[in-house]
Amino acid sequence: MKKKFIILLFTLGMLLTPIKSQAYDTNAGFTSMVNNIQIEPLKKEYHLINGHNGMKTFMSYTAITDKTSNQYALQQMAYTDEMGFRKINNRYCVAIGTAFEAPVGQIFNVELDNGEIIPCIVGDIKDDKDTDASNVFTSQGCCLEFIVDIPRLDGIIKTLGDCSSKCDEWNSSCFQYVIYDINYLEKGEDKWNG
């Protein structure tokens, strides 16, 4: 009985995580609160291999031109923030590889080695020919490509080709992806804050 109780506590500990204001987008509309504990519908966690160089590249949102695609539909709902990043509900629109099995519109967080959390939404899927054999990293060692409005993007980011210079907290390698069982396109924009 004692062993079952310990396993139950361990399982509950994995499901219930303390609130961290810097770690969660409180406007995301997909969390539940119980006694100051935040419960989120977790789908998968992916721990990234060591040796990732930390580079976070960018692509122009205007490169998404197929008007029949989910990528295009999502960009019609997105806005450009003051630094040139495309966002939906304070989540960064990004392109990721197929290894994560996350379709366009999927909500996820990227945890960096330094503990910083970047709230993201899948805005595009990297073609397998543009990633390594694991379908995670590009030839530049990037596993997270931000979708941006290039004319509005900060000059230093454009010069370096790396979004890590957005702020000191982002100057760290990606440690893991936490993918939630929520898809913005399936839930619908009108129901997002409900």
Where would I find each of the regions flagged by the language model?
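Solvent-exposed, well-ordered loop and adjacent helix/strand elements within mature globular domains
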Residues: 24-194
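Sec-dependent N-terminal signal peptides of Gram-positive bacterial secreted proteins and lipoproteins
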Residues: 1-23
